[in-house]
Design a protein with these regions (language model features):
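Gly/Ser-rich catalytic/binding loops embedded in alpha/beta enzyme cores
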Residues: 3-167, 171-174
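Structural helix-boundary/capping segments
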Residues: 3-15, 40, 163, 168, ...
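Serine-dependent amide/ester hydrolase catalytic core
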Residues: 39-44, 309-406, 460
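Short, well-ordered beta-to-alpha junction loops that form the rim of enzyme active sites
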Residues: 88, 128, 252-253, 286, ...
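Charged, often glycine-rich, active-site loop that binds/positions anionic groups
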Residues: 138-146, 293-308
Length: 461
């Protein structure tokens, strides 16, 4: 009788369990092309799609093993573009797991936002999310900025695009859940106007702030694909494009006691670029909306806590401690405060168009966050993704993302430069009126034409 050596056996298994290591470990060159250039090449020579699909097949198994952002995949025959969908959005034929370890359902139909996709866009994957949108960590790695936490909750949406596994990804944005991962990965992230009718088939977290969001490498990439997404029934009457937009920097974010020197310097670079475009920004205050940032977090927390009774009955699985910590914050929001926040939101949203008219601006610009993106972190039991008013540093923790969320407005995040050490992307947010998605794409494209795309390396795993 022979006896296997435990260490030798596991070593042998690990050496042979992955994809063929002899090829496919370097990102294909075609994935470095802009989508506009790829579109031109495919129009001239459609056979390229099959060649590129073969290269993608070799790359994807290595890339996803390393970056760990895809939760389900399905085959597509030589697609022109690949779409990933956050695992809180239903896709017929693929399981929806909601970031939970031991739950899934198989939807009969796809979410409303996916109804009218152009056939050149293939929905090829579901992508990772944090548990129920409110926990720490989706298990993904940041492709171009490996020391930076990719953030959440639409983590896989940003990581899959940054890794070249998707050309575009659909996520959801409640309080920054698309904008944060996009900015942390050096991508562009668009939060759309909040509309209940656009959210059929999307897991609800905070229904009055939930919104669809899209991630691409650049504003121009998103501009190429936006007409192919079939969103016309959801977009509404869009604000008209202009030769010059009226732009203002948010005065509150200029406070050096709140916003770090690095982010203020980045904002200065964005300001100069806008001036070069003939749209020199002024400054504007939004005191009523600014005062609601904490309310946005409290509303989200309370909504999650109220829904948790239904979750517990349906999911029947153990929740991560950080999910429970976030729910605990919601439990502490009183019924009277909850009603007060709803009334405050109604009042603010009812007057937001008049505010833009009176301020004579089309866009308000401010940093993505008070500080640079945070490094990979190791949260401990008791920590929560939802800040509590009693926490130290609360004004910084509630950040700037709730401004678009509480008002229901669209916003786009655009990377402007790298941090001084070159390890982190620094980004602005541009917030527009309701139904200004096309305007936001337009100004973001122009801004990136001046600032340029962030330098990135060709990925190898």
């Amino acid at each position: 009788m022979t006896h296997a050596n435990t260490q030798d056996t596991i070593t042998q298994y690990l050496s042979s369990c992955g994809a063929n290591a002899s090829h496919g470990r370097e990102q294909p060159e075609y994935l470095g092309l802009s989508l506009r250039k790829r579109h031109e090449l495919l129009q001239r020579n459609p056979a390229l799609a099959a060649d590129w699909a073969a290269q993608y097949g070799q790359w994807s198994v290595h890339a996803d093993s390393h970056y760990r952002c895809l939760t389900s995949t399905r085959e597509a025959q030589a697609p022109w573009y690949r779409l990933g969908v956050k695992d809180t959005v239903d896709v017929a034929g693929l399981p929806t797991r909601l970031g939970l370890r031991s739950y899934r359902h198989y939807p009969q139909r796809s979410a409303e936002a996916l109804t009218f996709l152009d056939p050149r866009i293939a929905l090829t994957s579901k992508v990772a999310t944090t548990e129920l949108n409110i926990a720490f960590g989706a298990g993904c790695r940041n492709p171009h900025f490996p020391s930076i936490d990719p953030s959440g909750s639409s983590t896989g949406s940003a990581v899959s695009v940054a890794a070249g596994l998707c050309d575009i990804s659909l996520g959801t944005d409640v309080l920054g859940s698309v904008r944060w991962p996009a900015s942390h990965c050096g991508m562009v992230g668009l939060r759309m106007t909040q509309k209940a009718e656009s959210l059929a088939g999307v897991f609800p977290l905070s229904p009055r702030m939930d919104a669809l969001g899209w991630v691409t490498r650049s504003a121009d990439d998103l501009d190429v694909l936006f007409p192919l997404l079939g969103l016309e029934p959801l977009l509404g009457q869009q604000q008209a494009l202009k030769d010059r937009y009226r732009v203002a920097i948010l005065e509150h974010a200029l406070d050096p006691a709140l916003t770090s020197p690095a982010m203020l310097d980045m904002l200065g670079q964005a300001r100069s670029a806008l001036a070069d475009l003939g749209m020199a920004p002024g400054e504007v205050a939004m005191p009523e909306l600014w005062a609601c940032r904490g309310d946005a977090w409290q509303l989200c927390a309370r909504d999650a806590w109220l829904a948790s009774a239904a979750w517990a009955r349906r999911f029947d699985c153990e929740l991560h401690w950080s999910t429970l910590s976030a729910l605990k914050v919601g439990e502490g929001v009183s019924d009277s405060d909850y009603q007060r926040i709803h009334q405050r939101m109604d009042t603010l949203r009812g007057g937001i168009d008049a505010w833009f008219d009176q301020a004579q601006v089309d866009f308000v610009v401010f940093p993505m966050d008070p500080n640079r993106p945070f490094d990979r972190r190791n949260p401990q039991p008791g920590d929560s993704t939802i800040p509590s008013p009693a926490e130290p540093g609360y004004e910084q923790k509630i950040s700037f993302t709730p401004l678009a969320s509480f008002s229901g407005l669209p916003a786009i995040t655009v990377p402007i430069c790298l941090s001084a050490d070159g390890k982190a992307p620094l980004a602005v947010q541009i917030m527009g009126r309701r139904d200004s998605e096309r305007q936001l794409l337009d100004i973001a494209k122009r801004l990136q034409a001046v600032t340029g795309l962030l330098p990135t390396r060709r990925l190898q795993v």
